[in-house]
């Protein structure tokens, strides 16, 4: 198992999307640091378990990004808990956590939980609407969220989420500059080695999600691109 | 200066309330572990500075509980930052923090900041209305907030706020039972030694606020009552 603070590249697989055994094998054996299982729509216990069982055949680190209380199941190496810092509704900042802990507080293994301070920045993405995110932010707003994540809340992760399109590199750069202990995750629009390499210059962790469903071959090249960057 | 994790008794002074020099001296020399400066209404830079300057003549630890961005001033030993965990509006959970850090992020000394996970429980109190708190909670809700504060957010403090009336001892007891590293602060309706002693059996820190404006002599006796309890 690869410890979360050593991650540089991760693939994010959506339980609600189809993936062939061959493609899944290529993803799991790609040399990526971890697979995150997570999605926005129709994440159920059934499709989560089904995907999890297929991934578990490979020795790759596997984390569940918890989006639905009903879809939590034991056995993952980590449980990533998003807090949407720029949501306009308390349920996405703390409410879902409270509900989960009220129900499962006594049996949770807290060591496996990792908080992600999300900053959702693509207003056209499903997740922005779903989580009622205020995406009309300037770069100083984002920097302030990064500082909150690092110093005030001491989250393990700060997650710049552009979901579906690539965000401006300046935002990644500025957020990176104020983070030390908190790891910067970047997700959104990474489809090939060049995309990944550009982001890896600043983000600690590059997430490749949709890209692998669109062009697997190109998506697989992001692993090497990120690793090369980190080994320089 | 007394480190925050050694506090057992604190007095909370409201910048918007009058206190004579004699009373202030008695409070500061009472043996309490710290004075918290904070209030809900009409906290201004002027009245905060004025109270602070008077307290600083004494060698007691002094913390500012930040409620208004305009009333922040350097020189306090600690800055307590409330996050109202059961607020129904994001501004009380994270919004005010974001605004403050956007403005002052570069000059903040993060070592002096202490997060307080507030659970505001007296629906009739000004603060509940002000912070739009959902006070209709059962004991399991409160326990879940305590667990969130301890394990998920790792706040230094979890604050049971009954502001103006005494809360049920069972709530204090149950919250206390799930907290280890996070210190349990209790505030609300503590007017005399008996009140303080009862709460000190479970809370790490007993706050005496309004009581000292109502009957100073009785309020001062709470210091000894808490200390006695902790030394048993």
UniProtKB/Swiss-Prot annotation, chains A, B:
It comes from Shouchella clausii (strain KSM-K16). Sn-glycerol 1-phosphate binds at residues 12, 159-164, 189, 209-210. Pathway: Membrane lipid metabolism; glycerophospholipid metabolism. SUPFAM superfamilies: FMN-linked oxidoreductases. PANTHER family: HEPTAPRENYLGLYCERYL PHOSPHATE SYNTHASE, PTHR40029. InterPro entries: GGGP/HepGP_synthase_I, GGGP/HepGP_synthase_sf, GGGP_HepGP_synthase. The keyword Transferase applies. This is Heptaprenylglyceryl phosphate synthase. GO terms for biological process: glycerophospholipid biosynthetic process. Its cofactor is Mg(2+). It catalyses: sn-glycerol 1-phosphate + all-trans-heptaprenyl diphosphate = 3-heptaprenyl-sn-glycero-1-phosphate + diphosphate. Pfam families: PcrB (PF01884). Homodimer. Belongs to the GGGP/HepGP synthase family. Group I subfamily. The lineage of its organism: Bacteria, Bacillati, Bacillota, Bacilli, Bacillales. Its EC number is 2.5.1.n9. Mg(2+) binds at residues 14, 40. Keywords: Lipid biosynthesis, Lipid metabolism, Magnesium, Metal-binding, Phospholipid biosynthesis, Phospholipid metabolism, Transferase. Prenyltransferase that catalyzes in vivo the transfer of the heptaprenyl moiety of heptaprenyl pyrophosphate (HepPP; 35 carbon atoms) to the C3 hydroxyl of sn-glycerol-1-phosphate (G1P), producing heptaprenylglyceryl phosphate (HepGP). This reaction is an ether-bond-formation step in the biosynthesis of archaea-type G1P-based membrane lipids found in Bacillales. The keyword Lipid metabolism applies.
């Amino acid at each position: 198992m690869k410890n979360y603070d050593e991650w540089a590249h991760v693939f994010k697989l959506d339980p609600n999307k189809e993936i062939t055994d061959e493609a899944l094998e290529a993803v799991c054996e790609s040399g990526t640091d971890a697979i995150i299982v997570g999605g926005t729509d129709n994440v159920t216990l059934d499709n989560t378990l089904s995907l999890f069982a297929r991934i578990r055949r490979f020795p790759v680190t596997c984390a569940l990004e918890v989006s639905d209380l009903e879809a939590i199941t034991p056995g993952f190496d980590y449980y990533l808990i998003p807090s949407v810092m720029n949501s306009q509704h308390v349920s996405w900042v703390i409410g879902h956590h409270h509900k989960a802990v009220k129900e499962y507080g006594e049996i949770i293994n807290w060591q496996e939980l990792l908080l992600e301070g999300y900053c959702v920045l693509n207003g056209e993405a499903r997740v922005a609407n779903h989580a009622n995110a205020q995406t009309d932010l300037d770069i100083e707003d984002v920097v302030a969220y990064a500082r909150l994540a690092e110093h005030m809340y001491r989250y393990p992760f700060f997650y710049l989420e552009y979901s579906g399109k690539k965000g401006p590199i300046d935002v990644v750069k500025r957020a990176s500059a104020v983070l030390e202990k908190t790891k910067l995750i970047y997700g959104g629009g990474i489809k090939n080695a060049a995309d990944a390499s550009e982001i890896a210059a600043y983000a600690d962790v590059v997430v490749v999600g949709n890209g692998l469903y669109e062009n697997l071959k190109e998506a697989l090249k992001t692993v090497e691109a990120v690793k090369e960057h980190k080994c320089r």
